[in-house]
Amino acid sequence: MGRQRRCRWAQPWTLLLLLLGPRLLVTHGWRRKGDKNSENTNILELYLPAVVEYALHVYNMRSQDMNAYKVVRVLRSWLELSEQKEEKGLVFSMELQFARTRCGKFDEDIDNCPFQATPDVNNTITCFFTVDTEPWKTEFQLLNDTCLEGSAE
């Protein structure tokens, strides 16, 4: 009788492990509560797209070129630790590569505009931006921007 009772207790646990086994393998990795790198990575993943869009918008508005530029790729990005009182949000630094498009910078659908493919014109720009932002309020402030014509490669 005692043996039967152990089997009855073992069966629900075995069934539970079989049912949850695949889910346990797919769960996110454990992180220490104060792990800054994990926190920064999550913040970058969440807010970087909006900050990149802002930087591109600023570049297009300040550019003397009548054509719009689009992001080719994010070369590097990181979250700065700010100790200045006037910087109340998150401070992102990023190096972006832009390329000239066939569309004007005031056209409606720049996102779907093809890149310009003229070999005699250098249509690639590499820029470094530092942006202070409170993206949850859609507030952005450009702290630094430096651009160079040509590829960063």
Curated annotation (Swiss-Prot):
Localization annotation: Secreted
Signal sequence residues: 1-27
InterPro entries, alphabetized: CST9-like, Cystatin_dom, Cystatin_sf
Keyword Signal on entry: yes
Superkingdom of origin: Eukaryota
The entry's keywords: Protease inhibitor, Secreted, Signal, Thiol protease inhibitor
Keyword Amino-acid biosynthesis: no
Pfam families reported for this sequence: Cystatin
GO-annotated biological processes: antimicrobial humoral response
GO-annotated molecular function: cysteine-type endopeptidase inhibitor activity
GO cellular component, one term: extracellular space
PANTHER family, alphabetized: CYSTATIN-9-LIKE (PTHR46945:SF1)
Family: Belongs to the cystatin family.
Function in brief: May play a role in hematopoietic differentiation or inflammation.
UniProt name for this protein: Cystatin-9
